[in-house]
Amino acid sequence: MRVGVLGIQGAISEHVEIMRKALGDAGQEGEVVIVKKPEHLEGLNGLIIPGGESTTISSMLKRTGLFEEVRKKAIAGMGIMGTCAGAIMLAKKVFGGNVETLALMDIAVNRNAYGRQVDSFEADVEITGFEKKFRAIF
């Protein structure tokens, strides 16, 4: 399995680290790579778009040529997951901001405003199929 983490902006290293841990904990052989250019998408089974700032991510996806390539790969069947701003980038409808999204998921999200995320936290959560609790960041 080969999984990419979009390396444009946001919590990149955290997503790479936790994906490597998840693969190991599941006994799954695999590689986690950072995606910064369209050619980095080749051979991926999945892509994670991490949190960050959605307007920045959208702008950088377009500048790097990744916007349409990510859409094409996802439509062709590549798995894709987004956390926080990454989830915003996947939504078909966004409230609270003018951001062009990949529009890959039939969901509507309410975009938060700029500023500190004072309610963020980490917790160990139980996930069906995992033998141990999983350290998650919210």
Question: For each predicted feature, which ranges?
Answer:
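Structural signal for conserved beta-strand scaffold positions within catalytic alpha/beta enzyme cores
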Residues: V5, I34, G82, A103-D106, ...
